[in-house]
Amino acid sequence: VMKPAESGVANPTALGQDAALLKWAANSRLSNDEIAPYRLKAALAPSVAAAEEKIRIDYNRLLQQAREIIDSHEFTIIEGAGGLMVPLSGGFLMADFAAALKLPLLVVCRPALGTVNHTLLTLFAARTMGLPIAGYMLNRMPKQKTLAEEKAAHTLATLTTDELLAVLPDVEGDE
């Protein structure tokens, strides 16, 4: 597993919440620096947070590190940061990182109002950029759904040919 850059990390000497969850879920033996090379305090797009903190995100180093992880593992998940079109480093977007690695995308969507537009735009951008799409999933579906949350999966399924792979419930605590 890898999260190339995580922002909004209270203590950048440790893993942020996302990277820590990835490490735990994968039972990974990789070091914190391998899993999340750039941990940034400011809750901003990675390149913006890095600039605020006077840190330079080395895009080529990230690619090399990702390729080493991919080459040494049978299965690898690389979690993006903020979305496909979020600036990662300099003029490079998360989409550029995905394209360079040639990995299929799993688009993770929130079920709330606005997700149909957000998800379709992401899938459209990925297709336009020639990125392979494994599918999409709705994450953190609440037990008590709003009408928008209740209709999200069906609405998306009628508007895209990409595969809905899962609808995962919101869980609390140690569930």
Q: Language-model segments: what does each one mean?
A:
Residues 1-3, 32-36, 76-80, 107, ...:
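General beta-strand structural signal in soluble alpha/beta enzymes
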Residues 1-56, 60, 65-68:
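N-terminal phosphate/diphosphate-binding loop that engages ATP/GTP or pyrophosphate donors
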Residues 6-8, 113-114, 142-143, 172-173:
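Conserved nucleotide-binding/hydrolysis micro-motifs of P-loop NTPases
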Residues 44, 157-174:
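Beta-strand-loop-alpha "switch" segments that mediate conformational coupling across diverse proteins
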Residues 50, 150-151, 174-175:
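Short, surface-exposed amphipathic charged segments that create phosphate/polyanion-binding patches used
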Residues 62-66, 119-122, 171-175:
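Generic hydrophobic alpha-helical segments
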Residues 69-74:
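Short, high-confidence coil segments that cap the C-terminus of an alpha-helix
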Residues 75, 80-164:
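Conserved catalytic-core segment of NTP-binding enzymes
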